[in-house]
């Protein structure tokens, strides 16, 4: 099975996001990308939407519920939100939705900054392996992978998807 082209997915996601925002009567959303791949997707999506407003970035490393098991990611950076969260309509963007735990962590962090009017979740890929009841409002594609497979977004330009085989990586 070949992996989809991120640029094509993002073009369609922009169409779907416009429709979603119009249905909800949201005219000035604030974009937030989850590091790292979600930031790349958010930048491309915001460009496709013709929106030049400042974009926020979240690093959810300290908010993950598996922090004590997996340890801290070696490249933790501070989150940057160049706007108030309180009362804003937010578009939260991630590259790959798997268990839902990254999104849960992102929502926890966002609410530490204030109470948004709404959060629209946008994901490039859903791996259909959810452990939490989290579903994107706008989705590029759903992929079903074997238990030993993962997908990684590379970028920032051009964006590309690569399949990773955890079984062969652990055999090394």
Swiss-Prot record:
GO terms for molecular function: uracil phosphoribosyltransferase activity. CDD domains: PRTases_typeI (cd06223). Signal peptide: none annotated. Its EC number is 2.4.2.9. SUPFAM superfamilies: PRTase-like (SSF53271). GO terms for biological process: regulation of DNA-templated transcription. It is an enzyme of class 2 (transferase). Pfam families: Pribosyltran. A motif (PRPP-binding) lies at residues 90-102. The keyword Transcription applies. It catalyses: UMP + diphosphate = 5-phospho-alpha-D-ribose 1-diphosphate + uracil. HAMAP family: PyrR. Belongs to the purine/pyrimidine phosphoribosyltransferase family. PyrR subfamily. Regulates the transcription of the pyrimidine nucleotide (pyr) operon in response to exogenous pyrimidines. This is Bifunctional protein PyrR. It comes from Pseudomonas putida (strain GB-1).
